[in-house]
């Protein structure tokens, strides 16, 4: 039986800190960060707004691929959520795609305060090549992963469970700390499990301390 995680974190108090085009423009690499990544139409902004119970914390757009910057939000002192650029949208110019990929890869490989990665995938189209690449990057860097199968309300219960079981089976091949859950911003499904996972990461992970060496 699942118990509700006790936490002193109030996600409704999460506030926007800054946007950055790449890792060099981010604030000091200290504390704990949990990043949200996903294809441009995976529902990333909606998930962040649902998590924090704020309608416009993260901008949602009818045009997938609008999030071109790394966006930082503070939950509490030294505890941040990071909205990474959406990837994989066909109509984005090739050069911009490469730029985003570089920024994503650099952030995942070099950001020491990154302790957890939430990868969002449309439950109807999970585990595309770039989704798998994100999970591989995280596992190779010993970063824990939570896969959220979004838009779960689009499928009937039986199909939803089948997709969940299929993806859970598939991610075993990554040989890492990869958990998979269903999520629906519309129905508020899976929000408690997301908060519990974030609570665990923010409370159990070791925060990165300030050092004298700068990059």
From Swiss-Prot:
GO cellular component, one term: cytosol
One Pfam family matching this protein: MMR_HSR1
Keywords of the record: Cell cycle, Cell division, GTP-binding, Magnesium, Metal-binding, Nucleotide-binding, Septation
Cofactor(s) annotated in UniProt: Mg(2+)
Keyword Metal-binding listed: yes
Domain EngB-type G residue range list: 30-204
PROSITE patterns: G_ENGB
InterPro entries (alphabetical): G_ENGB_dom, GTP-bd, GTP-bd_ribosome_bio_YsxC, P-loop_NTPase
GO process terms (BP): division septum assembly
A single MF term (Gene Ontology): GTP binding
Binding site for GTP: 38-45, 65-69, 83-86, 150-153, 183-185
Family: Belongs to the TRAFAC class TrmE-Era-EngA-EngB-Septin-like GTPase superfamily. EngB GTPase family.
Protein name in the entry: Probable GTP-binding protein EngB
Source organism phylogeny: Bacteria, Pseudomonadati, Pseudomonadota, Gammaproteobacteria, Enterobacterales
Gene it is expressed from: engB
